Amino acid sequence: MMKRILFATDLDNTLLFSHRHRQPGDRCAELWNGAEQGFFTPETVDLLPQAARQVRLLPITTRSIAQYQRIRWPEGAVPQEALTANGAVLLRDGEIDRDWYDQSWELVRAHQGVLRDLLERISAREDVASARIVENMYVYAACSDVAAAERCAAAWAQDAPFQMEVSGRKVYWFPPGIDKGTALRRAAGRYRPERILCAGDSVIDVPMLRRADLAMIPDGTLLPALPAERTLVCQENVRFPDFVLRTVLAQAGPG
């Protein structure tokens, strides 16, 4: 069945969230080393399969392939496609789409030396707990705390021709073209949807949210960067994943 609506969504802190935000009744969405790491709300578990039947569900996440594959989706809600590595790697039924990957590789091939050099120098910092190149596409650093992430970002802000983003204690360096907006544009070219809905919570999501016919955000933090007439802010006293899925189903109409 051709689905006329494309629902492109961030994952962490949008559809699922960590143990720090867990509430009674939440369902485990991810195990890591045997421990419950991520969670869905009960309403998300109920609504996500309905949404998956009515719209094309397309996660777009900074997660690596391995991190994405740890997610335990509700029955009937496993996405057929997902864009990992900030949109650089398309998984179709769990397998890498080689055409998509090759196109992404062309965007980053000339930057591989800079990526490796940046990784080497960032890894040497005492306030960086871990750093790596994700799927050959971008550099990621996990710092000891939020203040360390800000220091790390300040130290390398002008060091490479990349887009740098800070999210909590994490810092990302994305080469040109490795952003969620570019990924969504490429996906829309493939799927030709009539309408695009997007949900996200961080500055990394802004390029994707700007391309939406309707964008959904958890609060007003990102609103200055988005077209207000095409952006919905989560209602008070409603958990963001539930707000997102209620909105998607309302936009899709009767199933």
For the regions a protein language model found, what residue spans apply to each?
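Short glycine-/acidic-enriched loop or helix-start segments at secondary-structure transitions
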Residues: S18-H19, Y68-I71, D93-G94, P207-M208, ...
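Active-site phosphate-binding/coordination module
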Residues: G38-I122
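Asp-based, Mg2+/Mn2+-dependent phosphohydrolase catalytic module
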Residues: D219-G255
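Conserved acidic, metal-coordinating active-site core of Asp-based
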Residues: L118-R211, T221-L222, L226
